[in-house]
């Protein structure tokens, strides 16, 4: 997946900023904005400073449910969707679609079931934990692709990442 044309990644629920730090380290034209709650942004800023990336990564204190998304051409969610039921995930998907300009991309990075939801074991076990601790569950690539399609995204693709993680991506036409 070629991300070289993107200039600003909004790392939604970006936590420590680990994904933003890695992304800007390998994509020289990319800047990142970590969107999270105040105390979490403070921690992320410490890591950004530790890596000397203050000129390329900023933090933005906001609540992903209630506050508007700042302008960006790439929306990135890592380990977010599994915390929420389908209707909340769709809300985020649609919010990204409305916020992105044409040509903008969404990327969802998460532990995924196979499309038949028969395995693998790790996402199934993880789903049980999520159902007990959060409102969420594990999803399949097909389920997340369906959410992206319903929201209006095109060129939807699922790519395996590391371990049981995959990325689901789509473009706003």
What label would you give each PLM region?
Residues 3-173:
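Alpha-helical subdomain
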């Amino acid at each position: 997946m070629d991300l070289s044309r993107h200039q600003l990644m909004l790392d939604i629920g970006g936590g420590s900023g680990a994904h933003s730090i890695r992304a800007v380290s390998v994509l020289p034209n990319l800047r990142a904005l970590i969107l999270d709650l105040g105390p979490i942004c403070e921690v992320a800023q410490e890591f950004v400073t530790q890596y000397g990336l203050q000129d390329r990564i900023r933090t933005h204190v906001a609540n992903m449910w209630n506050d508007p998304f700042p302008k960006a051409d790439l929306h990135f969610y890592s380990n977010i969707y599994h915390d929420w039921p389908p209707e909340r995930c769709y809300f985020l998907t649609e919010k990204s679609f409305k916020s992105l300009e044409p040509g903008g991309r969404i990327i969802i990075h998460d532990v995924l079931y196979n499309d038949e939801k028969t395995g693998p074991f790790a996402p199934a076990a993880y789903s049980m934990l999520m159902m007990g601790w959060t409102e969420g569950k594990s999803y399949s690539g097909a389920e997340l692709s369906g959410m992206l399609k319903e929201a209006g995204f095109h060129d939807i693709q699922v790519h395996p990442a590391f371990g049981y993680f995959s990325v689901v991506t789509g473009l706003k036409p």
